[in-house]
Amino acid sequence: MKLMKYFICILLCVCSLGVSAQEDNIFLSKWGIEFGASVGRAQLTGNELALNGMTSNGNWLVSYYATERMRFQTGITMSFFSNGSLTADNYYNTNAIFIGIPAKIVFSITEIAPKKAAIVLGIGVQANKAINYQLETKDFSKSTSSGSVFLGVPISIGVESKLSDNYTLGFYLSTQVVTKSYKNYRLQNNDLLRIAVSYRF
């Protein structure tokens, strides 16, 4: 509920920014880049474990604008998971790093201010791999695992506002639903609040 309240406040702020943005430039390229970061709750599962914790993510994406209201994206995402609570399995500290390659489509659902701000929906598929996984148990022993591969479906809804002809600012609520795991550990994101800046060439 707190995330939803923050999101509504951000939505109102972004809408006000969009009102003062410039009109579209018909000479813009179909290509662009996007840099984003998110934070929120996540669950790490695998090998009979189900650990709830916090995650922070960064992403670097390339965008192809098929139309003014729809774009395709791919790139690299990196997720950091941490959990510091005692569980029934006596694990009290968990850290994991995952890298992902998404392929998704983002399209405008409705315009809030014509050609200035819009509500957007994003959905796709993402291949993820654990590049580091570490557990610390109650007796201070440690174990490290890597190589876990799993597929997920990233979903997001948010609001985007044009700051200028080239720059767009976006705020989103996002998640990743895990669909398949080929090896041990999987990371499922829940209730992420994401901010991103896009630049269209």
PLM feature segments, named:
Residues 21-65, 200:
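Short glycine/proline- and aromatic-enriched beta-strand/turn motifs that initiate or cap beta-hairpins
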Residues 34, 119-125, 172-174:
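Extended hydrophobic secondary-structure segments that form protein cores and membrane-embedded regions
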Residues 1-29:
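Cleavable N-terminal export/targeting peptides
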Residues 22-31, 68-70, 110-119, 163-167:
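Short loop/turn motifs that connect adjacent beta-strands in outer-membrane beta-barrel proteins
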Residues 44-51, 84-90, 131-141, 181-189:
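Outer-membrane beta-barrel translocator domains and adjoining extracellular loop/strand segments
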Residues 39, 61-138, 198-201:
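Gram-negative (and chloroplast) outer-membrane scaffold detector with strong preference
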Residues 79-86, 96, 144-146, 150-201:
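Predominantly the C-terminal beta-signal and adjacent terminal strand-loop region
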Residues 29-31, 50-56, 93-101, 117, ...:
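Residues that define the transmembrane beta-barrel architecture of outer-membrane proteins
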